[in-house]
A protein has these predicted regions:
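Sequence-specific dsDNA recognition surfaces
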Residues: 14-27, 41-73
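Hydrophobic structural patches
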Residues: 1-3, 165-176, 195-198
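Short amphipathic coiled-coil heptad-repeat segments
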Residues: 1-13, 181-199
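Short, tandemly repeated low-complexity microdomains enriched for cysteine and small residues
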Residues: 26, 49-53, 176-188
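A short glycine-rich beta-alpha junction/loop motif
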Residues: 24-27, 96-103, 129, 136-160
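Non-catalytic DNA-recognition/assembly elements of restriction-modification systems
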Residues: 1-24, 151, 155-156
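A short beta-sheet element
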Residues: 39-40, 61-124
Length: 199
């Protein structure tokens, strides 16, 4: 199933889980209301999917569409530039959501090898972006060769190390977000004081 090399595990996305496609059979009239789905931009812009940035699509009760689950790794599948193909993100929410048609997902089932929250950082690494770049094929429009990517070998830290790394990076992210909020407050306070000077 996988091979251990010292402090690393050699595996592949095909061994870590099962892949699925995004929405299919939809027209422009189906969008705007209904069930939440993850947009291309949400995947492209965030290493963890933002749950306050869903859009909506009409889906019937008996309609067969793939559902995104907690821990799924999502990738952009198609773009006009190769740099935008294969950009990854991870869904860490619990709401039942769907995925746009220009992305695909991998449902991580082998949680003895991969810690999904850690993968949100892993797929954002510069080294991983360089690794995935050759799988973007095309001329005027580029598509990710999904089958080859799934079979390609990747190296992960041990599960224990993944959890430790995620914990450290998660705390740093929280610190950055706190600092960002404080900066916004200071800027608001500055603007208020400047306005008071000229009343």
């Amino acid at each position: 199933m996988y091979t251990q090399y010292g402090d690393e595990v050699l595996t592949s996305f095909a061994e870590l889980g099962t892949s699925y496609s995004g929405l299919s059979g939809k027209s422009a009239q189906d969008f705007g209301s209904g069930k939440p789905f993850i947009t291309y931009l949400n995947v492209y812009s965030n290493n963890v999917i933002k749950e306050n940035d869903f859009q909506y699509v009409a889906i019937k009760d008996d309609e067969k569409q793939n559902v995104v689950k907690y821990g799924d790794v999502l990738f952009t599948l198609s773009s006009e530039t190769p740099e935008e193909v294969g950009v990854g993100s991870v869904y860490l929410g619990k709401e039942k959501v769907y995925l746009n048609s220009f992305c695909f997902g991998i449902h991580i089932t082998n949680t003895e090898v991969a810690f999904p929250p850690y993968l949100s950082y892993y797929v954002s690494l510069t080294a991983f972006r360089k690794f995935i770049y050759p799988y973007a094929q095309g001329s005027t429009r580029f598509n990710l060769c999904k089958a080859d990517l799934e079979k390609a070998s990747i190296k992960l830290p041990t599960l224990a190390d993944q959890k430790r790394i995620y914990s450290v990076l998660g705390h740093i992210d929280c610190k950055i977000e706190t600092e960002r909020q404080m900066l916004n407050l200071y800027n608001s306070q500055k603007q208020y004081l400047l306005r008071q000077m000229f009343i």
